[in-house]
Amino acid sequence: MAGQKVRTRFAPSPTGYLHVGGLRTALYNYLFAKRMNGDFVIRIEDTDQSRKVEDAEKKLISTLEWAGIIADESPMHGGNYGPYVQSQRLSIYRDYCTRLLEDKNAYYCFSTPEELEENRQLQLKQGLQPKYNRKWLPEDMGGNMPESEIKKKLDEGAPYVVRMKVPDYVSVWFEDMIRGPIEFDSATIDDQVLMKSDGFPTYHFASVIDDHLMEFTHIIRGEEWLPSMPKHLLLYEFFGWEPPKFAHLPLLLNPDRSKLSKRQGDVAVEDYMRKGYSSEAIVNFVALLGWNEGEGSEQEVFSMEELISKFSLERVGKAGAVFNVEKLSWLEKQYIKTRPVEKIVGNIKPVLQAKLAEFSPEMSVERITSDDYLAKVVELMRERVNFEHEFVTFSSYFFFEPESYEEEAVAKRWTPNVPPLLQEFADLLEANDDFTAENIEAQLKAFVAPKGLKPAVLIHPIRIAVSGVSFGPSLYHMLEVLGKEAVLRRIRRAIERIEVPAA
């Protein structure tokens, strides 16, 4: 395998959503391949037809592409090693199964599900690890079943599976790129089913054959596949193939260090997409679930290009990685703070257009959807929002007149002297031809000073009148962005609508 071009793969089953653990596996395979100037491949493992979900394959690939993980070869992109869907490769698996049967490395098994369960329960009662009892192992392979009985069953068309014959008393060993040397005793290995009664291969059989035929050099996958390694290595040995290098990634854990599961929170990438997390933040976050740049590095925000240049399996740990959503949210904030304004503007326009289809704005649509106006909103709000969609939802007062006013703020700030003061100040603003933040601030201070009042007497009521809430960015800059016409209309409307709270 020395000198061979690096080839890695992500091989999901089309059974539904893309798990965040699956995204990490795909990402690490992608980063490793790209770092080594190799190829990253997507193969769909749909041998379990009972669990197959319609369109799951397309959704999986589109989610990966949204994350910036683009395959060099896949069912959608094609390639020289196809088909890339296992259900389209059945004749290949049957041919290799026949070869194993002929070489006495596999055998037919006609045991019924009831017999298998009975045997399993018996072994459990005896305190044994359940394994197939080799009832149908032929006499010429060390078993007790006459060849005539096997032939009779085949001639009758009885349903069967094909099992691998695990050698007795051998040690199966390999060097994991993350965990080091690992050894298995064949006495602990079951005679794995290779071909099911429906004519489809099991994951173990199809995966080994495809990994060899597609010439993958490195198999990077979750540690949950470690128990399957001896079966896979034996199959490589049966066929006389050199196995690829293997790396088994650490488990993903909840904050309480239990295994990450849907019972304790969202585990689908699509869940986080719907909440508004960006692909950059999710990829950055997932990359750090097991990998770190090394001692002395304090960098936590990485672009895809940086991840490719810095990623190595040597820096992937063995211990479980804690999935902390707070860290993901922190990363999202960092990206919003540094993302180019024009990119954010382009991203939030569809969100705003959807809102405009529901609600009518008081200002012209042309103005509030213009790049110039949206850029001002972004610059003013980017320190205050957690997700891009909040530039529209959390900051809706930049686009729509408030329909209500925060009750607690009104009770505290809307005193009896506020309406006449606001009316008087609004008249002054109307005559202001220089409607900038600096000018508005100077005008307000000059207005309240002779009255012996502090600016806060008007600052808070103006914010309530204009935005409907008691919090937000710099008031003066907010007024400048909204513009004189909208500000005056909202102040005067609030004077009419808000009742002075009873003393």
Swiss-Prot record:
PANTHER family: GLUTAMATE--TRNA LIGASE, GLUTAMATE--TRNA LIGASE, MITOCHONDRIAL-RELATED. Its EC number is 6.1.1.17. PROSITE patterns: AA_TRNA_LIGASE_I. The gene is gltX. Monomer. GO terms for molecular function: ATP binding; glutamate-tRNA ligase activity; tRNA binding; zinc ion binding. It comes from the Bacteria. A motif ('HIGH' region) lies at residues 12-22. Belongs to the class-I aminoacyl-tRNA synthetase family. Glutamate--tRNA ligase type 1 subfamily. ATP binds at residue 262. A motif ('KMSKS' region) lies at residues 259-263. Keywords: Aminoacyl-tRNA synthetase, ATP-binding, Cytoplasm, Ligase, Nucleotide-binding, Protein biosynthesis. The keyword Electron transport does not apply. It is found in: Cytoplasm. GO terms for biological process: glutamyl-tRNA aminoacylation. This is Glutamate--tRNA ligase. The keyword ATP-binding applies. Pfam families: Anticodon_2, tRNA-synt_1c. It comes from Chlorobaculum tepidum (strain ATCC 49652 / DSM 12025 / NBRC 103806 / TLS).
